[in-house]
């Protein structure tokens, strides 16, 4: 059993689950990126088969990194705009109180953050006006235009509207589709964790998991492990804050007795 690999975390993922999810199926051999060769187990019927031992090992490493990072208060952004994964991305991010982009990556979403923040402020303003019924007090044509603008902004910014600053770590599903996000992270020095299929470039990712990035079942399993790792980190962070708060109270109490 693959679970004998001494995972960093108490991962429940097994080899059987990974195989059942089709996590080992890569792309057609003719479409491969030679840099992925160390993570390919074999070729069958012109399809590359990913080495699941490598997948598991890299997932352990990424999970530990996530937990350690979130334990010190770092924030995570999930990115995945492919139609088949967009809802999975939002669900995973919301489940672990993180941020997400699942509609379209806007140019400069991170590198031009100050401009994006203005758009977020506009979205929040429109949502507030609608919530308080203010749009019903202006001409219908003008109200319709504002509602349309709100919906457009919400489509792209809903997942990051509560993100106060650029994230510390970005989890990317679909390197080819999210290459602009990859480049912006590289430019800003933001660490990335990427699910890499056999046609991807591992040199563009800080940490990566060799795995099928098209299968919904495969992505669900991997996102589930990310969420677990993040939640563990959040629990650690909350406990540290509580201990710090208790310590401050004790010090204050001792000083008041002097």
Curated annotation (Swiss-Prot):
Pfam families (alphabetical): Ribosomal_S2
The keyword Plastid belongs to this UniProt entry's keyword annotation: yes
Main location: plastid
Cellular localization per UniProt: Plastid, Chloroplast
PANTHER family, sorted: 30S RIBOSOMAL PROTEIN S2 PROKARYOTIC AND ORGANELLAR, SMALL RIBOSOMAL SUBUNIT PROTEIN US2M
Regions annotated as coiled coil: none
Keywords: Chloroplast, Plastid, Ribonucleoprotein, Ribosomal protein
A GO molecular function held by the record: structural constituent of ribosome
Record protein name field: Small ribosomal subunit protein uS2c
Species of provenance: Tupiella akineta (Green alga)
CDD domains noted in UniProt: RPS2
Single GO cellular component term: mitochondrial small ribosomal subunit
Single biological process term from Gene Ontology: translation
Similarity-based family: Belongs to the universal ribosomal protein uS2 family.
HAMAP family according to UniProt: Ribosomal_uS2_B
């Amino acid at each position: 059993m693959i679970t004998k690999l001494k995972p960093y975390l108490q991962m429940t993922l097994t080899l059987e689950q990974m195989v059942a999810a089709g996590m080992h199926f890569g792309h057609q051999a003719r479409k491969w990126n030679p840099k992925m060769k160390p993570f390919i187990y074999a070729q069958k019927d012109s399809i590359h088969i990913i080495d699941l031992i490598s997948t598991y090992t890299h997932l352990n490493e990424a999970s530990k990194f996530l937990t350690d990072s979130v334990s010190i208060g770092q924030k995570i952004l999930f990115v995945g705009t492919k139609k088949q994964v967009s809802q999975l991305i939002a669900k995973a991010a919301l489940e672990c109180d993180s941020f997400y982009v699942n509609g379209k990556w806007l140019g400069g979403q991170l590198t031009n953050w100050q401009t994006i923040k203005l758009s977020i402020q506009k979205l929040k303003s429109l949502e507030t006006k609608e919530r308080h019924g203010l749009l019903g007090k202006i001409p219908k044509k003008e109200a319709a235009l504002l509602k349309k603008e709100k919906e457009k902004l919400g489509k792209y910014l809903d997942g990051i509207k509560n993100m106060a600053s650029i994230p510390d770590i970005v989890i990317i599903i679909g390197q080819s589709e999210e290459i602009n996000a990859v480049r912006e992270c590289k430019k800003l020095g933001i660490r990335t964790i990427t699910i890499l299929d056999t046609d991807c470039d591992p040199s563009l990712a800080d940490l990566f998991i060799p795995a099928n990035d098209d299968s919904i079942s495969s992505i669900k399993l991997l996102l589930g492990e990310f969420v677990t790792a993040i939640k563990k980190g959040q629990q650690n962070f909350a406990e540290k804050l509580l201990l710090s708060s208790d310590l401050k109270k004790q010090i204050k109490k001792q000083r008041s007795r002097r």
